[in-house]
Amino acid sequence: MPYKTKSDLPESVKHVLPSHAQDIYKEAFNSAWDQYKDKEDRRDDASREETAHKVAWAAVKHEYAKGDDDKWHKKS
């Protein structure tokens, strides 16, 4: 289901990503949720939710990287 606010995000996202990365995750998830509503638009047998989470993480990884300190940092 789409997320209305950052506070609605899963704990595994809220506790590891900085605020801006959470915004990216939320927007990408919501967009993918709409885009991949039809099963034939998804790869493999992934559910709509699984697909949306994969897209959201890919969007975050496009702008952020996990550092040696195990924290997410904006790429320069």
Swiss-Prot record:
Claim: Transmembrane helix is one of the keywords in the record: no
InterPro entries attached to this UniProt entry: ChaB, ChaB_sf
Any Pfam family hit: ChaB
Keyword annotations from UniProtKB, A to Z: Transcription, Transcription regulation
NCBIfam families reported for this sequence: PRK09582.1
Keyword set includes DNA repair: no
Subunit structure: Monomer.
Protein name: Putative cation transport regulator ChaB
UniProt similarity note: Belongs to the ChaB family.
Function: Might be a regulator of the sodium-potassium/proton antiporter ChaA.
SUPFAM superfamilies: ChaB-like
